[in-house]
Design a protein with these regions (language model features):
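Single conserved hydrophobic/aromatic residue that forms the stacking wall/gate
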Residues: 1-12
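Cell-envelope/glycan interface and biosynthesis
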Residues: 16-232
Length: 232
C-alpha cells in the first residue's frame, strides 16, 4: 500500500521535528517542501509555468521546460546594453515599470541577468564547479533544471552607479519597494536554511503584487509562501 504525498508528510513530521529540533510550524514547512530530504533527492517534476512556479533543489523543471511568452528586455534597461536578456512578458513589463520608478528617484537600476535555458545553467554550473569546487557550488549555484532563472520570472539586478549592488542606493530602494511591483527578495540571509541558497543581494523573483505584498508583510520566503498559501 503506497502512501499519498500528504500521508507521507504526516508520518514523518513528528519524527523529523524530534530529530532536528525545529518548532512545529517550521517542521511542517520543511516536510511539505521535501526539505527533510537531501538536495536533488527524489525531486518533484514541475510543469507549472505561472508566476508562482517553485523551482529549487527539490522542485525540478527538466530539460524541456521553456517559459511561455519569453520577451527580450530593451537594451537601455540592461547593464551591458544586451538585447539577449529575456524573461516572461509579465515579468519583463513589471521590471521595466520598477526600473522607471527608481529612475524617477534619481537611481540607475538595471537588469544584469534574466532567463537561462537548461543548457545555459548547465554551462554555468560546470564553469563554477571547475573554478571553485563542489563546496562552493553547493552553496551558490544550483544544477541545471533546478534554477529559477529557467522559469523566466527571476532577474539579477545591478546598479549603474556601483560595482557592488549590495552597497548601492538601488539595492536599498529595492528592499523597500520591489514588492510594490510584484518582486520578492528571493534569497534572504535569514532564510538560507529554507532556500538552501546563500544570500544573494541581486536576485529578485517576480511573483505578482498579491503574493509579493504578503511575502513582504509576513517576511516569508517563496518556499514558505508556497507551503502556506499554494500547496495546502
Amino acid at each position: 500500500h503506497l502512501l499519498s504525498r500528504r500521508q507521507r508528510q504526516m508520518c514523518i513530521r513528528d519524527r523529523y521535528m524530534d530529530e532536528v529540533g525545529d518548532d512545529e510550524e517550521t517542521t511542517v514547512i520543511k516536510v511539505n517542501l521535501d526539505l527533510d530530504k537531501s538536495p536533488y533527492q527524489d525531486a518533484i517534476k514541475v510543469t507549472d509555468k505561472t508566476k508562482l512556479v517553485l523551482a529549487n533543489k527539490h522542485h525540478y523543471l527538466g530539460k524541456e521546460y521553456i517559459p511561455n511568452n519569453l520577451t527580450s528586455i530593451p537594451q537601455k534597461y540592461t547593464i551591458d546594453g544586451d538585447d539577449n536578456t529575456k524573461g516572461t512578458k509579465e515579468a519583463v513589463d513589471a521590471a521595466i515599470k520598477m526600473i522607471e520608478a527608481a529612475k524617477k528617484e534619481g537611481l540607475n537600476l538595471l537588469v544584469n541577468s534574466g532567463y537561462r535555458s537548461y543548457t545555459d545553467q548547465e554551462e554555468t554550473y560546470n564553469t563554477y564547479l571547475s573554478l571553485y569546487g563542489e563546496s562552493y557550488v553547493e552553496r551558490f549555484v544550483v544544477k541545471a533544471g533546478y534554477s529559477e532563472h529557467q522559469t523566466g520570472y527571476a532577474f539579477d539586478f545591478a546598479s549603474g552607479n556601483s560595482n557592488i549592488f549590495q552597497n548601492s542606493q538601488e539595492y536599498q530602494w529595492m528592499i523597500k519597494n520591489s514588492y510594490k511591483y510584484g518582486f520578492c527578495y528571493r534569497f534572504l540571509r535569514s532564510k538560507e536554511e529554507i532556500t538552501e541558497i546563500r544570500h544573494e543581494a541581486w536576485h529578485f523573483r517576480y511573483v505578482g503584487t498579491k503574493a509579493a505584498k504578503i511575502m513582504d508583510k509576513e517576511e516569508l520566503s517563496l518556499e514558505e509562501y508556497y507551503a502556506k498559501y499554494v500547496e495546502k
